Amino acid sequence: MTDVPVSRLRNFCIIAHIDHGKSTLADRLLQDTGTVAGRDMQEQFLDNMDLERERGITIKLQAARMNYTAADGESYVLNLIDTPGHVDFSYEVSRSLQACEGALLVVDASQGVEAQTLANVYLALENDLEIIPVLNKIDLPGSDPERIKEEIEAIIGLDTSTAIACSAKTGLGVSEIMQAVVDRIPPPADTLDEPTRALIFDSYYDSYRGVIVYFRVISGRISTKDKVLLMASKKSYELDEIGVMSPDQCEVNELHAGEVGYLAASIKAVADARVGDTITLLNAPADEPLPGYTEAKPMVFCGLFPTDADQYPDLREALDKLQLSDAALKYEPETSSAMGFGFRCGFLGLLHMEIVQERLEREYDLDLIVTAPSVIYKVNMIDGQMLMVDNPATLPDPQKRESIEEPYVRMEIYAPNEYNGTLMGLCQERRGEYIDMKYLTTERVTLIYELPLAEVVTDFFDQMKSRTKGYASMEYHLIGYRRNDLVRLDVLINAEKADPLTTIAHRDKAYSIGKGLVEKLKELIPRQQFKIPLQASIGSRIIASESISAMRKDVLAKCYGGDISRKKKLLKKQAKGKKRMKAMGKVDVPQEAFMAVLKLNQTS
């Protein structure tokens, strides 16, 4: 299986925006090369998680090995490394690009070039990959291949004279793509005689065999007899098995430079086999690891709490297990007076957060409360210290701090130009700073804004999509921190501070957010036997308040006429009971209330 000469290997990936047909094209390639039998075929074959199929997105990286007989009669081995297209998962894209020599750039022939496509193309160009433009969905009535070719040339600067038109759905043009992969993507460098180095581009946890590591051999060879050393974690392992994915795992004895495969070595946690780490041989280690890996940094933080306190150990275990397959997920224990014990978790972005939450609820049967997402703020203290704060409730008091800095992103929005005004309005509402506007073609425009990450992480994406009927797409990257007039907005329910509802807001927006918040809570918190005051405060100053009136029992129902003092006595007794109840009473805050905070931050 592995005696393929390096010259007949091709490693490639598919770059595409969400919904441009990447997973469908991958399915078609698997089917056309006979890698997957027709009867086993299902849509989005490489998307293993149910969640991926439902949302129609690729989250975890997959790889597949295909045998293909080219026009010259030679048999080639093609390794397809499937990549996610969503901006949150760009770290997964960057590492899979390092494992390839070429890429298929798939563009929807009716939609044109979108934001994430561009971000990933630039990553691919940085890695010196050979890029083959592919126009997909040409069977659709709205497709306009010539216009899209001009767009690709104008925006990316790629020559599209050899672009391939195809329809992944019907299979049209797929054989031309296979031939182009063989003809135009270079084979891996012939480095069989150099010290063994292999790049880990993905790993997942298998409950029977431990961590399964997907890797690409960059130089030398690896066989089942070898002991391997992971250069970043400095841990060594004996190999249990190595093999290739076609796309089901298939064991082999040896893999050499240029090949893509998997290994199992009873590795206990994914943290020991970090993605981007270099595998080398224990007996003959390489001098230095492969360059270019940076650890994924969480950008968005939120609290996760079980609704039932007894589920806390289960939540810890579930997060431990999820982290085995998701190296970008960070978490630490957190306690809150209102919610009890839970965890503060860090994510790459909002989609990543939603997916982790959904996987916890679905795969581990947990019922969770999620607090409003926040970002990392830099707080400069009066005594000269600098703190990094990811939880608004832990922000120091105003008298102790000198200033707060928040992360800013540079955002590029691509959209048809009739939506210009509404998009500029949206960015303005979110404290955006206009930088530039470029016309890509006569119909499409790029808006460039710099805005606070905190304004982006909640529902900016949803708002952008709804205001442009789904036609706009965006891409952003961090550009640094800026000082702003920010305040901590606390919410008091029945005179008790509710930590999970605390947010950090700009002073100009604080009043409207606070007012909206208490009004929303008034709708969502069920009435109790006693009156509940709801207040929003900045420091000790109350800026907005509402109250939920008490339910009361008619204690006078059994008094017919009679003496007024009898009625007064009963009413007095009731008032006394209510007072005691108010002092002792706990108010349960429903999950919707926490989610309302997110929406409010934005609409104000």
Curated annotation (Swiss-Prot):
Query: Where on this chain does GTP bind?
Result: D19, H20, G21, K22, S23, T24, N136, K137, I138, D139
Major location (coarse): membrane
Domain named tr-type G: which ranges? 7-189
Q: Which UniProt keywords apply?
A: Cell inner membrane, Cell membrane, GTP-binding, Hydrolase, Membrane, Nucleotide-binding, Protein biosynthesis
Q: What's its membrane topology?
A: Peripheral membrane protein
Q: Which reaction does it catalyse?
A: GTP + H2O = GDP + phosphate + H(+)
What CDD domains does UniProt report for this protein, alphabetically?
Answer: EF4_II (cd03699), EF4_III (cd16260), LepA (cd01890), lepA_C (cd03709)
Question: Which terms in the GO cellular component ontology are assigned?
Answer: plasma membrane
What subcellular compartments does it reside in?
Answer: Cell inner membrane
Cystine bridges: which residues?
A: none
Q: Name one GO molecular function term.
A: ribosome binding
Q: What is its EC number?
A: 3.6.5.n1
What functional role does this protein have?
Answer: Required for accurate and efficient protein synthesis under certain stress conditions. May act as a fidelity factor of the translation reaction, by catalyzing a one-codon backward translocation of tRNAs on improperly translocated ribosomes. Back-translocation proceeds from a post-translocation (POST) complex to a pre-translocation (PRE) complex, thus giving elongation factor G a second chance to translocate the tRNAs correctly. Binds to ribosomes in a GTP-dependent manner.
NCBIfam families in the cross-refs:
lepA (TIGR01393), small_GTP (TIGR00231)
Report the PANTHER family cross-referenced here: TRANSLATION FACTOR GUF1 HOMOLOG, CHLOROPLASTIC, TRANSLATION FACTOR GUF1-RELATED
Q: Which family does it belong to?
A: Belongs to the TRAFAC class translation factor GTPase superfamily. Classic translation factor GTPase family. LepA subfamily.
**Mind telling me what this protein is named?**
Elongation factor 4
* Source organism of the structure: Prochlorococcus marinus (strain MIT 9303)
